[in-house]
């Protein structure tokens, strides 16, 4: 990868981090589901991923900026896994199953929503 590719990833990840921290800030301590900002960020990242996939982006630098940089830094898969681990450690198995299903299903549904919205209204 050339130096400009790293720069696209760096700039994209910077914006992804800023948006993620903004969502964390505005969500505060109010829990919408089991976990507030991690669920919100993962669902939004899935929606954005669906939208961008529907746009069929082929520009290599834009792919690095959006998919690798922005969405890679914006989404919180490692935080999701850490929360699942903590639920196992705390022996909260029912909450673990509900939270797992909630994140996976909502993320998948919002990916599909973003993809089909893009196909319907933009393409």
UniProtKB/Swiss-Prot annotation:
<feature type="transmembrane region" description="Helical">
    <location>
        <begin position="94"/>
        <end position="114"/>
    </location>
</feature>
<dbReference type="GO" id="GO:0046872">
    <property type="term" value="F:metal ion binding"/>
</dbReference>
<protein>
    <recommendedName>
        <fullName>Fluoride-specific ion channel FluC 2</fullName>
    </recommendedName>
</protein>
<dbReference type="GO" id="GO:0005886">
    <property type="term" value="C:plasma membrane"/>
</dbReference>
<comment type="function">
    <text>Fluoride-specific ion channel. Important for reducing fluoride concentration in the cell, thus reducing its toxicity.</text>
</comment>
<dbReference type="GO" id="GO:0140114">
    <property type="term" value="P:cellular detoxification of fluoride"/>
</dbReference>
<keyword id="KW-0407">Ion channel</keyword>
<keyword id="KW-0812">Transmembrane</keyword>
<feature type="binding site">
    <location>
        <position position="75"/>
    </location>
    <ligand>
        <name>Na(+)</name>
    </ligand>
</feature>
<keyword id="KW-1003">Cell membrane</keyword>
<feature type="transmembrane region" description="Helical">
    <location>
        <begin position="62"/>
        <end position="82"/>
    </location>
</feature>
<keyword id="KW-0406">Ion transport</keyword>
<comment type="similarity">
    <text>Belongs to the fluoride channel Fluc/FEX (TC 1.A.43) family.</text>
</comment>
<keyword id="KW-0813">Transport</keyword>
<dbReference type="Pfam" id="PF02537">
    <property type="entry name" value="CRCB"/>
</dbReference>
<keyword id="KW-0997">Cell inner membrane</keyword>
<feature type="binding site">
    <location>
        <position position="72"/>
    </location>
    <ligand>
        <name>Na(+)</name>
    </ligand>
</feature>
<keyword id="KW-0479">Metal-binding</keyword>
<feature type="transmembrane region" description="Helical">
    <location>
        <begin position="3"/>
        <end position="23"/>
    </location>
</feature>
<dbReference type="InterPro" id="IPR003691">
    <property type="entry name" value="FluC"/>
</dbReference>
<keyword id="KW-1133">Transmembrane helix</keyword>
<keyword id="KW-0915">Sodium</keyword>
<feature type="transmembrane region" description="Helical">
    <location>
        <begin position="38"/>
        <end position="58"/>
    </location>
</feature>
<keyword id="KW-0472">Membrane</keyword>
<dbReference type="GO" id="GO:0062054">
    <property type="term" value="F:fluoride channel activity"/>
</dbReference>
